[in-house]
């Protein structure tokens, strides 16, 4: 069990979510095992037993997430309330845990998957495995980041970015990783005639997307169309470890392989039917999501429902921004994303992420994803004057 817990602690570090040697992962086997010794291990063990879960993670946040989450927790307790797609889908809000006790942890985690403990880090539980808790830690960090910058942009627009806010913003910007490169690494050139070739290309493109910071590994998806059969990442598959996690789904619906495919299968299939490009890449680059949520129409009657009902054509440069929730429901992005992407390099789904496409391989799709995120980051920091 120590091997399992230390593996997930190392994964948190590689993802840039936690400083080296700081993650505390607890998981059940015949007893509760921990990734490292810590004075809080008895507290986490008692919280796990009360919750009846298989795993509990306490992840001290790496910068800039630490500055962001400490800032938000101090000002928004008892709960941080982001508005991005991941929060709407997974959390509703992020409880702020008032003290490092089993009682306080259980009170928060009995109603939410993740929480924030000021001075300590992100708390997350998994009913069965550390993978579930890892996903939650990643989502809390992403949601906090997006909320911090969308709040800052709104304050600039309202003339309310005061000195404390400016100081926090300066610290966060100083800790940002580099922007995506103008020339991303070259990937295999298509078209790919066999599934073996396409799988290798998707594995490499998924890994590059994660390494460039364009998606957290547990989110996003990827597909490639070979003669009307769509190879697509499975639901919950990590983009940087796609080996064995791809399904082949006929576009004519003649197979049930799509049962384990990405939740965005319907959107990928809809795009494949109307666009001749074979390669589709979907990431969650943070600044593109942030800028998609930045709107000057404060009196809009759909304010608060922007992610599904935005009534106005919006763009980031030449890239359209469309509403649409996850899946194929009546307000699903399956209805908005495909027509917007036809003939364009990419499209941003409001509060969610970016879809791009390439004719024969993933080089064009990856380059477009980088370019959209670079422009979004530049526009955001320019608007904030930092």
Residue ranges and their predicted role:
Residues 1-386:
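Glycine-rich flexible loops
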């Amino acid at each position: 069990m120590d091997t399992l817990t230390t593996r997930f602690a190392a994964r948190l570090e590689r993802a840039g979510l936690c400083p080296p040697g700081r993650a505390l992962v607890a998981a059940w086997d015949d007893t509760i095992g921990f990734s490292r010794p810590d004075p809080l291990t008895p507290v986490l063990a008692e919280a796990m037993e009360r919750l009846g879960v298989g795993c509990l993670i306490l992840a001290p946040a790496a910068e800039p997430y630490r500055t962001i989450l400490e800032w938000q927790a101090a000002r928004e307790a008892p709960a941080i309330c982001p508005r991005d797609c991941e929060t709407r889908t997974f959390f509703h809000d992020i409880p702020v845990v008032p003290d490092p006790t089993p009682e306080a942890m259980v009170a928060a985690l009995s109603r939410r998957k993740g929480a924030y403990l000021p001075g300590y880090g992100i708390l997350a539980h998994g009913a069965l495995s550390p993978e579930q808790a890892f996903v939650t830690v990643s989502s809390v960090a992403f949601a906090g980041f997006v909320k911090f910058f969308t709040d800052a942009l709104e304050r600039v627009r309202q003339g309310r970015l005061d000195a404390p806010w400016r100081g926090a913003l300066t610290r966060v910007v100083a800790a940002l990783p580099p922007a995506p490169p103008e020339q991303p690494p070259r990937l295999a050139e298509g078209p790919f005639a066999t599934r073996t070739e396409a799988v290798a290309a998707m594995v490499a493109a998924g890994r590059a997307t994660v390494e460039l910071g364009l998606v957290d590994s547990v989110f996003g998806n990827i597909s490639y169309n070979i003669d009307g059969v769509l190879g697509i990442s499975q639901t919950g598959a990590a983009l940087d470890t796609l080996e064995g996690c791809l399904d082949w789904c006929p576009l004519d619906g003649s197979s049930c392989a799509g049962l384990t495919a990405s939740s965005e299968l319907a959107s990928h299939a809809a795009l494949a039917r109307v666009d001749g490009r074979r390669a589709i890449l979907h990431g969650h680059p943070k600044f593109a999501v942030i800028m998609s949520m930045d709107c000057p129409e404060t009196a809009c009657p759909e304010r608060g429902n922007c992610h599904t009902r935005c009534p106005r054509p919006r763009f980031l440069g030449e890239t359209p921004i469309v509403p649409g929730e996850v899946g194929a429901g009546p307000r699903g992005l399956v209805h908005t994303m495909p027509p917007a992407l036809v003939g364009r390099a990419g499209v941003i789904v409001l509060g969610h992420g970016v879809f791009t496409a390439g004719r024969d391989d993933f080089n064009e799709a990856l380059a477009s994803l980088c370019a959209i995120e670079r422009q979004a980051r530049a526009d955001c920091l320019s608007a904030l004057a930092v």
